[in-house]
């Protein structure tokens, strides 16, 4: 009897311990469940049927090079369902039909199909090939080309000799190589804001090019021979520009006016030699005007200055013969940062009758004003500049 009671007590104790253990586990599980994030609800409820959809935003890429695959990045589509709700819809390439980049196409209709409903948009396949961001081939026979945004650089001679009227350069393009449009029939080029570098001779012999608007680019240098013999009537330069290379505008017979951006410090050798430019605006901060920068510009009538002065360069100089052979020049302002006026600066000019020498000028070299028509000179500095023999040779008495 005693043994039976003992067994019953043992069983009861075991049951109590088991119950406590289960309760503890249950509590821990409840706490664990509280820590879990709530289960996400499906974006489309079961049973809701698509009635129609709209294309809210086209893909970022709508212009393709030959051989490129469809890219739906940026595409936004909204579906309307029979429960009265609108939801975003993800579109996969397998839901696209009509796309092919095997041949050029001005307008190619691409169709999205979702649950039997369809919407279309238009893409373009340019007559070019691109490999690793480099333009590798341009097909002939096209008057106008818009480059796809996969192009990062245009190599040397890419459009050399091409019979083409207009090229739209894509956003994302960084550089253009030597002689890229040399001797082509290009009439118009649209430049992107991302352009950072040009190499030499790009528009050499481009007689039909009338305007070059580089103002949105990030160029810091306009390289040598950029527009030699080009037909440009207007060139707009970017505020980021610091240097204009040698002969950049040599023999530009249609160019009439040019404003040099305020950050430009250097104007290279013979930059505007034998150009038909009539008016020029120079920044006061320019520190180097190389030899013959405006040599034999037969129509040049006015050179004026503007902007801030940067006078920290003791060698800032207008080099020899910079404005020689400009018979119509009647007004010439010397940039205020200049320290040295070179030999033959205005040699032979008879129309400039008044000249102001800025305060920063410390030296005027031999025959700087040889045989000119200057009648009045104003020196702004308290200390007259150093002069050499025959600086004023040819001045009227």
Regions from the PLM with identified roles:
Residues 156-158, 178-180, 200-202, 223-226, ...:
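Consensus positions within tandem repeat domains that build extended binding/scaffold surfaces
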Residues 55, 77, 110-112, 123, ...:
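Extracellular/surface recognition and adhesion modules
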Residues 61, 85-121:
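Serine/threonine-rich, repeat-prone extracellular segments and beta-strand-based repeat modules
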């Amino acid at each position: 009897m005693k043994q039976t009671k003992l067994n019953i007590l043992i069983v009861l104790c075991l049951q109590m311990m088991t119950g406590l253990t289960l309760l503890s586990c249950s509590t821990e599980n409840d706490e664990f469940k509280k820590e879990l994030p709530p289960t996400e609800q499906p974006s489309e409820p079961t049973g809701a049927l698509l009635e129609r959809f709209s294309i809210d935003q086209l893909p970022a890429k709508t212009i393709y090079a030959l051989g490129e695959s469809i890219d739906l990045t940026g595409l936004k589509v909204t579906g309307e369902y029979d429960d009265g709700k609108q939801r975003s819809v993800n579109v996969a390439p397998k839901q696209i039909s009509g796309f092919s980049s095997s041949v050029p196409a001005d307008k190619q209709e691409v169709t999205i199909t979702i649950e039997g409903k369809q919407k279309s948009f238009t893409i373009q396949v340019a007559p070019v090939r691109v490999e690793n961001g480099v333009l590798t081939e341009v097909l002939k026979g096209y008057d106008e080309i818009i480059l796809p945004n996969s192009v990062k650089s245009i190599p040397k001679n890419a459009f050399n000799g091409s019979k083409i009227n207009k090229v739209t350069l894509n956003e994302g393009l960084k550089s253009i190589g030597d002689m890229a449009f040399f001797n082509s029939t290009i009439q118009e080029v649209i430049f992107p804001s991302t352009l950072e570098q040009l190499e030499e001779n790009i528009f050499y012999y481009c007689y039909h090019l009338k305007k070059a608007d580089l103002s949105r680019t990030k160029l810091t240098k306009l390289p040598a021979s950029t527009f030699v013999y080009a037909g440009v009537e207007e060139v707009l330069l970017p505020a980021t520009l610091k240097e204009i290379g040698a002969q950049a505008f040599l023999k530009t017979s249609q160019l009439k006016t040019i404003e040099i951006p305020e950050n430009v410090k250097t104007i290279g050798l013979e930059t505007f030699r034998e150009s038909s430019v009539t008016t020029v605006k120079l920044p006061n901060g320019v520190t180097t005007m190389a030899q013959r920068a405006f040599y034999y510009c037969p129509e040049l009538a006015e050179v004026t200055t503007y902007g801030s002065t940067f006078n920290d360069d003791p060698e800032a100089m207008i080099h020899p013969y910079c404005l020689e052979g400009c018979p119509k020049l009647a007004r010439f302002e010397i940039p205020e940062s200049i320290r040295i006026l070179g030999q033959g600066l205005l040699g032979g000019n008879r129309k400039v009758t008044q000249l102001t020498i800025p305060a920063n000028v410390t030296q005027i070299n031999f025959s700087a004003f040889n045989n000119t028509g200057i009648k009045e000179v104003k020196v702004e500095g308290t200390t007259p500049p150093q002069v050499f023999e025959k600086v004023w040779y040819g001045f009227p008495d």
